[in-house]
Amino acid sequence: MDCNMVSSSQWDWEHLIMSNPSRTEDDSKQLPTEWEIEKGEGIESIVPHFSGLERVSSGSATSFWHTAVSKSSQSTSINSSSPEAKRCKLASESSPGDSCSNIDFVQVKAPTALEVSVASAESDLCLKLGKRTYSEEYWGRNNNEISAVSMKLLTPSVVAGKSKLCGQSMPVPRCQIDGCELDLSSAKGYHRKHKVCEKHSKCPKVSVSGLERRFCQQCSRFHAVSEFDEKKRSCRKRLSHHNARRRKPQGVFSMNPERVYDRRQHTNMLWNGVSLNARSEEMYEWGNNTYDTKPRQTEKSFTLSFQRGNGSEDQLVASSSRMFSTSQTSGGFPAGKSKFQLHGEDVGEYSGVLHESQDIHRALSLLSTSSDPLAQPHVQPFSLLCSYDVVPK
């Protein structure tokens, strides 16, 4: 057996063998060895373990036994936490006078620095249920390290650096009027976006980069003062587009195209509030046809003109007697009469429906220049709904 380092227990074993030189060679030949090796780390040492003890014949053997047993127990207690060791077993058959029949050799490696630290950490474990006992030195050291790292991260220099970076990425919005430079951090989002304070956004004349300007609330930009009208906060160009969208042409009826429903032509007419012309009696000419309107009361008669979907233009004449009549030989109106019901005195709202006459061919023959009523085109009846305002005198 080759060993690099010889321990005290090995020296005692060799000393015992040398004390009996007569049986050294014979015993070494007769003793078969059986090794059980386990890998480990650290300093190697050999500790004998006696599996059986019959008698001790000499004092040197007795002293060796006590020394070996004490050292083996000490090494076993120290290396109880060590996971690996080398174990060699020596089984010998000696004479009846020998005191040992079976000897175990344990080759143990001493724990390294890492194993010592692990053993010290495991010493904190409680014997009951594996709970960790409180170690003031162990936990106090870890708490101090954690607190030191946290305090280092929260130093004023680090916080100031972060705030400085945030300040550089988010500039403070200020008013761009010359001489103002008002902080707009607490202002409305509209003023922060366009960089103008509320006071200067309503001023009739401000100075921006040395030029006279005025803030347009419609364009949200600064324009020259000449582009604004007096007492107007929006530029003239934007106001013209705004008014054009809101204004409607007057004197024109907005008519829906004719549609066929239940074999009848329906026409809707909306009156835009234009003052009505008062006429006593008028003569209307349309192509080869002449319309003669004779209302019963001519004091407050008026005329309505509108255009149908087929392109023909028709006129209706009504009077304050709440009766109106119209006739056409070729334009699509049947001869008939309709009453207008007034909801109240001088209210100015009228509604009426033009009904089909009982004898349409007879009505057309009376107004037509042709003597043959069958030569006239067929006209479909329709309903007319009117609503308008009358300007009182």
From Swiss-Prot:
Motif window: Bipartite nuclear localization signal: 232-248
Principal place of residence: nucleus
Positions that bind Zn(2+) 2: 216, 219, 223, 235
Domain of life, source organism: Eukaryota
GO biological process assignments: negative regulation of auxin metabolic process; regulation of DNA-templated transcription; regulation of timing of transition from vegetative to reproductive phase
Chain spans, region Disordered: 74-96
GO cellular component: nucleus
Protein name according to UniProt: Squamosa promoter-binding-like protein 11
Source species: Arabidopsis thaliana
